[in-house]
């Protein structure tokens, strides 16, 4: 069986992630692979940018960086997003496995 190629890569000190977001989840967590993206479940509703703000706060905490270092590049209004994380201090276990670190 061929494993899917997940879109997570490094550009120097920047980590780039392609995500599939599940809003209104029971808890915040990085669920793992979802096709060629990483599924992230968050508790915030997809209303008035609440989910995006919550996602940035959650990922900043998970990667040990300031919120200003998490940049939403694509997908502001949809579930499919691309984010850049500048100089992550730590990698969540799910992401580390995908990068084979």
UniProtKB/Swiss-Prot annotation:
Coiled coil: none annotated. InterPro entries: DUF167, YggU-like_sf. GO terms for cellular component: cytoplasm. SUPFAM superfamilies: YggU-like (SSF69786). Belongs to the UPF0235 family. This is UPF0235 protein SG2030. It comes from Sodalis glossinidius (strain morsitans).
């Amino acid at each position: 069986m061929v494993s899917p190629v997940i879109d997570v890569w490094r550009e120097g000190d920047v980590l780039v992630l392609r995500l599939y977001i599940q809003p209104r989840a029971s808890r915040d967590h990085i669920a793992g692979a979802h096709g060629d993206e990483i599924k992230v479940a968050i508790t915030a509703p997809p209303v008035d940018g609440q989910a995006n703000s919550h996602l940035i706060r959650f990922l900043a905490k998970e990667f040990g960086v300031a919120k200003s270092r998490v940049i939403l590049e694509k997908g502001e209004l949809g579930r499919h997003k691309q984010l850049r994380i500048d100089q992550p201090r730590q990698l969540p276990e799910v992401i580390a496995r995908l990068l084979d670190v």
